Amino acid sequence: MVKLLTFKDSLIMEDMIKMLADAPEEQKLQMVTERVKMIAGQPDDQRVQSVKSMVIAISKLDSKKKSPFHGTRIKAIMSLSPEERMAMMVARARAVPELPEDVDKEDTMYVVQSVKEYPEEKQKAFMTALTKAFDTAGIPMPEMA
């Protein structure tokens, strides 16, 4: 039996994101990397709920903190093994129907901005993996302008 996230779990994620948003970059990256690695190892349904909670929690940050936090999240995900990274991408794709449309669009925009900071080869690899993740999830790939 998979334990899905409760309201309390979502609040814990929200509190963690708020706290980390003000942390020094090195500490933020370390903590976010540990968290996404842990989430990548969760059972599928729980992983989707964890990713959803993280995306929603980040969306609640003030605008000055969102972009840097998304950059940190992408850096953490890029540091995972290919299997863990794909698990996170598939979970993000599967979370799309459960996210408010404005939150999903904003998150997608920040992901694209963050990925553009990487060399072209890494950008292409990320986008190829993301396309595969959406195909695996059976969810239409959003516009990535």
Task: Kindly label every feature range from the protein language model.
Residues 2-145:
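Short amphipathic alpha-helical interaction elements located at domain edges
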